[in-house]
Amino acid sequence: MGGGNGGFGYEIPPEALTDERFANMIREAEKYLGYPYVWGGASPSTSFDCSGFVSWVINNCGNGWNVGRQTADGLRSCCAYVPPEQAKPGDLIFFQGTYDTPGASHVGIYVGNQVMIHCGDPIQYANISTPYWQQHFMAFGRLP
């Protein structure tokens, strides 16, 4: 259950997996490590873009959520704002200015320790403390 990295460079800390909602999310998300980025993609059969991936994980992780297919900014509107110092595994992380669109332009799932799982190309873990992600950081959000 969860915690594996599929060879993609990050191991979820065991203590994070004691949160059942997060464990469910990461179990679903890790199924797709290595899937390619596909603009507009929103399911395993088409692969994913960033918001399609996060929407799929939210809707299919078994936590009883159904947000439909949202954009990154749409997902932001589904969440309550979380100050960065209170972010925890399972919160969503939003970025702006990663391409030319207003509001949130990229979204990932925060897994703790300054790392997110997201649909880059391919779906992978990424360190959010790099200059690129820090420059584009917008907010953390928590689903109800």
Labelled PLM ranges:
Residues 14-18, 43-47, 130:
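Alpha-helix initiation/capping motif
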Residues 35-89:
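Catalytic cysteine-centered active-site loop
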